[in-house]
Design a protein with these regions (language model features):
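Conserved NAD(P)H cofactor-binding loop of Rossmann-fold oxidoreductase domains
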Residues: 90-95, 243
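Substrate-binding pocket helix/loop in short-chain dehydrogenase/reductase
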Residues: 98-99, 106-108, 205
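Alpha-helical segment proximal to the catalytic Tyr-Lys
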Residues: 127, 172-176
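C-terminal substrate-recognition "lid" of short-chain dehydrogenase/reductases
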Residues: 216-240, 245
Length: 250
């Protein structure tokens, strides 16, 4: 009987993209490690919903900018489940601020979670995967607009731009240690638009796609599953953006 597959999904405690990805993996038969930073009650609610699907679930707190905390989280997941087959890095910070008001602290905040947190989780989980004969799959989450940033997010977009470099670098590093470890990234377009956006801004985001609609967390979950299914894909940073990357509306 093959070993039970285990997925660690960061940022899956809150009802956002991470929890939808966790749901999709649970429906695929994965045991799921739900990560959260401070939202313990929401993480337990997410875990309860996954258990109702028949999945084995654990909740694991960690500040992803803290190397010791990430090491401890990965160690705890391995201690609970015995292995990690999939890591999906969904945890993110996204704050709008005009350039004149951006401080070094703002930049550090975004890089700590979006770049450093992604790296540390992929490093630690990836090295664990490299020690498994079956390897494993890491899926990071960047942002389509790293190539065409827009106003108001000067601290955010650079931190997400780092995710593509991290993805390609760790695809090379981990494959060198075990060719069965693959690392890819998803670059979402307008999915779960921030509530602080005005209706005009939301409509503009939709007009900027070729499909003329907002994406859903389910679209991101589908992309994650496609990376799991195709074992000849690694080092790829895939826009899931309704054509936003290639379209320049007037």
């Amino acid at each position: 009987m093959p070993p039970r597959r285990v997925a660690l999904v960061t940022g899956s405690g809150k009802k956002r993209v991470g929890s939808v990805v966790a749901d999709a993996l649970a429906r695929r038969g994965y045991a799921v490690a739900v990560h959260y930073r401070t939202s313990a009650a929401e993480a337990e609610e997410t875990a309860g919903a996954l258990r109702a699907l028949g999945a084995e679930v654990g909740t694991f707190p960690a500040d992803l900018a803290d190397e010791k905390a990430v090491r401890a989280m990965v160690r705890d997941v391995l201690g609970r489940f015995g292995r990690i087959d999939v890591l999906v890095n969904c945890a993110a910070v996204w704050k709008s601020k005009p350039l004149e008001a951006v401080t070094a602290a703002d930049v550090r905040l975004h890089f700590d979670t979006n770049a450093l947190g992604t790296f540390l989780c992929a490093q630690q989980a990836g090295l664990a995967m490299a020690g498994q004969a079956e390897g494993g799959v890491i899926v990071n989450v960047g942002d389509w607009a790293e190539v065409r940033p827009y106003l108001g997010y000067a601290a955010y977009f650079p931190s997400k731009g780092a995710v593509t470099a991290i993805t390609r670098c760790l695809a090379v590093e981990l494959a060198h240690r075990n060719p069965a470890v693959r690392v890819n990234a998803i670059l979402p377009g307008p999915v779960m638009l921030p509530p602080e956006l005005t209706d005009e801004e939301k409509q503009g985001a939709v007009r900027g796609t070729l499909v003329k609609r907002e994406g859903s967390p389910g679209n991101i979950a589908q992309a994650v599953l496609s990376f799991l299914d195709n074992d000849f894909v690694t080092g790829v940073c895939l826009p899931v953006d309704g054509g936003r990357t290639v379209y320049a509306p007037e």
